[in-house]
Amino acid sequence: MHEVFSLSYDPVQRHLAIEKLVVREGLEGQEKKYYRVRPARWYGGIVTADCVGCGLLCKFCWVSDKVMNRPVEVGKFYTPYEVAHGLVSLAKKRGLRQLRVSGGEPTIGKSHLLQLLDRLEREGCRFVLETNGILIAYDESYADELSKYDFVHVRVSLKGCNEEEFAMLTGAKSDGFTLQLKALQNLIDAGV
């Protein structure tokens, strides 16, 4: 019997490797790379800060290859304060009350995300956290820390309906699907 050569990757390890490229320590805390802040029609109107970098390579991803495949070259590093200011300023200008980080995986750079949420907590907005869940499964404390923010709505974007579909859609090892389910359980257990 011949063994089939596989190019699949470990989704956790890829997230951690991407994090080294798109997150750095700055004078005011963790800085993360972003490439734009924009209004969007989703959720009845929302302001989105598009970050750089994701640990998955989904075949259907809407992010341009020019962004997805060039995390070192694309975007600029911003502090949580700068991202919060950009989101809130545009939301006020547009009369919107919902905010999110998208364009990449928002859970990459945990300290940055939590500091961003700290900055947004008193703004009277709703924050939609769209995530693949991989790092929420990997880091047992992530869901507990997110539970401190009652204005955050977490949406785990499942990549397929089973391990086989996950592997087919992302190119990652199939057990990544189990990590997505574990993330959901961690969030439920934390009351998120």
What annotation goes with each model-predicted range?
Residues 46, 72-75, 105, 172:
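Pocket-edge positions in alpha/beta enzyme catalytic cores
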Residues 65-99:
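Conserved alpha-helical substructure of the radical SAM core
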Residues 26-38, 60, 76-78, 93, ...:
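Residue-level signal for well-ordered alpha-helical segments
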Residues 49, 78, 111:
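Conserved active-site and cofactor/substrate-binding residues in soluble primary-metabolism enzymes
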Residues 59-62, 70-74, 111-113, 139-141:
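Short, conserved acidic/polar surface loops in the N-terminal third of protein domains
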Residues 88-98, 103-192:
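Conserved AdoMet/S-adenosylmethionine-binding subsite of the radical SAM
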